[in-house]
């Protein structure tokens, strides 16, 4: 966003689950529509909305309600991407969003992408494998927002549920003071 402002580079892209989780109503309840509206206000309707923070079907409905059928793309980051992309394509087409693209991500590499051949996927978000290269060991570390202004927040998408609220680490130590495990 800063490069766009400073250098006149058109802003584009998607958002993280933490962006969606940051948007809560006055009762601390998730407000996915507010997150989508904020992203569209900044990036326009041609942006890519991440629709699987909570419920994918509802996320697509919310995206279309906020952006209309001219939405640039939706991104799916969880579940069986082939099955989910087919379901989402059907939902988009039934709503008249024929030109809305489907982008998938989720630790993709060339093998996972090849497995999606034939599915209605228009683009791929590849991160880890681009940095490390195929077959190299990786650490699957992901930032998870768990609380906003004292209210627990959590991703509830199928297969990637998180638990909201602050956490404390309880560690077991050897007599020498070396940590040996977490309880």
List the predicted regions and their residue ranges.
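Gly/Ser/Thr/Ala-enriched C-terminal appendages of enzymes
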Residues: 93-95, 100, 108-183
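Short, conserved beta-strand edge motifs with alternating hydrophobic and charged residues
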Residues: 50, 75, 102-105, 125-127
């Amino acid at each position: 966003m800063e490069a766009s402002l400073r250098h006149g580079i058109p802003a584009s892209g998607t958002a993280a689950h933490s962006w969606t989780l940051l948007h809560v109503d006055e009762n601390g309840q998730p407000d996915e529509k507010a997150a989508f509206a904020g992203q569209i206000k900044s990036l326009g309707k041609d942006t890519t909305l991440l629709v699987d923070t909570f419920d994918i079907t509802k996320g697509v409905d919310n995206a279309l309600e906020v952006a209309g059928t001219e939405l640039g793309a939706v991104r799916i980051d969880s579940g069986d991407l082939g099955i989910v992309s087919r379901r989402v394509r059907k939902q988009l087409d039934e709503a008249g969003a024929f030109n809305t693209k489907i982008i998938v991500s989720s630790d993709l590499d060339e093998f996972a992408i090849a497995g999606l051949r034939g599915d209605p996927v228009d683009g791929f978000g590849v991160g880890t494998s681009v940095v490390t290269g195929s077959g190299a060991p990786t650490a699957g570390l992901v930032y998870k927002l768990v609380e906003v202004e004292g209210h627990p927040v959590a991703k509830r998408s199928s297969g990637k549920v998180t638990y909201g609220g602050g956490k404390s680490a309880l560690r077991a130590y050897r007599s020498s003071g070396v940590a040996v495990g977490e309880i």
